[in-house]
Amino acid sequence: TPHSPPMEALNAKVADAATKSIVHYSFYFGATTTNPDIVPTLDKNRVCGVKLFMGASTGNMLVDRMEVLRKVFANAGILIAAHCEEQSIISANTTAFKEKYGEDPDIKYHPQIRSAEACVYSSSLAIRLAKENNARLHILHISTAQELDLFEDKPLSEKKITAEACVSHLYFYDKDYEALKGHIKCNPSIKTLEDRNALRKALSTNRIDVIQSLIHITEPTRPEPI
């Protein structure tokens, strides 16, 4: 619930799960630019990690100020799960594509606006901060071949920095926008065939540690049920 204050939202989720869940559960604490001082106070037995959006996201959860990022990485005694896209690159691309194609550029340009460059830059920064602070980092939904080179090909038990791939990035590539339009619009964007194939190949190595089954689709409308 990004629109709620993170601690309030966390408490609400825990209370709701307590009445409904039949399995063990835990939730992320959502880091924002205004709450990094709460991070070191989190109960490790209650919170599974800190969710960090290093790029455009929903509501107030974008964290793009370096001093805040440094605080989070220095003080988090639990896992940091990071969505990595560099906002300044996305903003510049958005402006350029709107100037060229109008206020609402075609969906096929989505992977060029939310580009591979934005992902690689942000993931590289997250990994650098994690190494500087000996933090436990998990980078969510890797979408480019270049990012794979940032991760070590060794057993999970020997790593503090891990990565995941999402089914949407493993299945689709940019040419699919022509037929599927906004139904495959997600962040990070679905990119090239080369990126998709590199992600698939990485599944047989130790560079990808987790396969995520679902990523939020950003298209605001859905087709009616048949």
Kindly label every feature range from the protein language model.
Residues 215-226:
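Single conserved hydrophobic/aromatic residue that forms the stacking wall/gate
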Residues 3-6, 62, 147, 226:
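Alpha-helix N-cap/helix-start motif
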Residues 37-211:
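Histidine/acidic residue-rich metal-binding segments in metalloenzymes
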Residues 31-36:
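Active-site beta->alpha loop and helix N-cap motifs at the rims of alpha/beta catalytic domains
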Residues 1-20:
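Metal-associated gating/positioning segment near the N- to mid-region
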Residues 1, 27-29, 140, 211-213:
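Active-site neighborhood of phospho(di)ester-bond hydrolases with catalytic His/Asp-centered motifs
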Residues 16-30:
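A glycine-rich helix N-cap at a beta->alpha junction
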